[in-house]
Amino acid sequence: MDRLDRRLAATLLLFSFISFSTQKTSISWCVVSEAEEQKCLDLAGSATARNIRGTLLCVRGQSPTDCMEKIKNGTADAAAMFADDIYTAGWCFGLELAAGESYNGVDGISYYVVALARRSSSDLSLLEMHERSSCHPRIRTTVGWTVPIGFLVNTSQISVDEQCNFPKAVGDFFGYSCVPGVKDREHDPRGSNPKYLCEACIGDDNERHICVNNHRERHYGEAGALRCVAENLGDVAFVKHTTIFDNMDGNNMESWAMDLELEDLKLLCPDGSEAGPFDHETCHLAVVPANAVVVRPEDKCRVWKYLERLQNAFGNTTMFSSVGYTQSDLLFSDSTHHLLRVVGSYTSWLGPSYTTVLQAFECESLC
């Protein structure tokens, strides 16, 4: 019996050794630009120099969607993605999340999307926006398009035709708007998007480049949408909750911003009520979740443990900062304070309000 026990013990030990030795110890990170690839290679070199267990490899992808495909088929293991891409990765590719970015606010939350209006605007309600005028940072963005239009669809204020033509539905709904980029060839290849979606735009100082998808349009971006409302060219601006404070108290030296007072503004709430500019936690269209690391479901634990080792070794200096590179937000958002483990599903990370908004666009066939 002793010989049998020793043989059994030796067999179990050999099996354990083989199992351990065949475990995948490398993490292949999907990157989508030359600058991101360089930061990935630099981080990999630093990790090797620190003798951190595991190996970081860098795999070049063409786009977030290409990275999703690579992660699904095993040619890459992980990539950090925005909220819209997380939904696509989970819904279309069956992927999950290993870690999420945390900023200086509440864990898992990136920002709130709010509807901002002048306090002097009376009889204004988010439940009765038909023929009102609207200001959007730009076309096809979370803040400027996905969240506000999704809200209008989900509250049955807008209905989309069989062709899933959202620009037409939005143009028919609002009296006039400024949606920079809506007439660009990329977003309007047939030239059929309604002209009303550009009528609150003003272009540059020479009144050229009206409604273009860049800063030559003075109503472009978060500050531009706020300016659109401040100058009384729009009834409501759809912006991040931080936009007001980013453009006041000397943070924006343009004349329109210098003349703006906090008491001049209010938030419009989803239930039709109003609130003050500081009340974004209770008066918002959606909570947009922070970026997160997309992986195959079976790799949630393995990828998290490697990221945890990197984080413990480097903190937020080497891992999160993109200083010294030609782009920002490489591998992770520059504003990331730390990574936290995602134990639940991708839908729990996205949250109910944001997931509901995205479901309004299912006719666009994400998959």
From Swiss-Prot:
Pfam families: Transferrin. One of its GO terms (cellular component) is early endosome. InterPro entries: Transferrin-like_dom. The keyword RNA-binding does not apply. Disulfide bonds: none annotated. Keywords: Secreted, Signal. PROSITE patterns: TRANSFERRIN_LIKE_4 (PS51408). Transmembrane segments: none annotated. Gene3D superfamilies: Periplasmic binding protein-like II. Residues 1-23 form the signal peptide. Residues 27-363 form the Transferrin-like domain. Required for normal otolith growth and deposition of otolin-1 in the otolith. Belongs to the transferrin family. This is Otolith matrix protein 1. The gene is otomp.
